[in-house]
Amino acid sequence: FLKRYDIEPKYEELADYLLKPIRKKIPLDLLRCYFYYCAPWMSPEPTDSEKKRMEEHEHLMEHLEGIERWAVRLGKLQRRWDGYKEYFEQKRVDVLLSVDMVRHSAAGHIQHAIVLAGDSDFIPAIEAAKESGATVSLWYGEDNSIHKDLLNLADITHKIDIRKMPGKKVKKDESK
């Protein structure tokens, strides 16, 4: 989401940014922030560009794992073909998020889940978390980036104000 706006987030401040409006109404402690992602594609004989992307990925993962109360969950990047066009798709990431949310809410580890997503694939997990007694806050970007059923299902919704998001604007690399 933030790549669209050329924002490099300050992950250390992200949890407080997301919790702030909720904490105005109820006291809320942070169990953990989970970051769901996957490593970039690497061909059998990686190009310099692929090696650079992997190095950046490893640096980010190391940074996130070093932040107190943060955990990284990695899926896999799968190479696919649509006719003659190659594309890449993240696999397992949505399932990992869903399993963690349902597991923690069912076990009573969390009373409030904060989700940054827009995909309707999360609807069953959010329903299960709510049935377990958790309140679900949904943060989303542009209106067209979120499924309306997901928006209607969440207990609380917040539209991300990119101007207040902790982070800094990065310059686009025109050579890419």
PLM segments and residue spans:
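Domain-level signal for Mg2+-assisted phosphodiester chemistry and nucleotide/NA-binding surfaces
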Residues: F1-E89, T135, G141
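Nuclease catalytic cores that cleave nucleic-acid phosphodiester bonds
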Residues: G66-K176
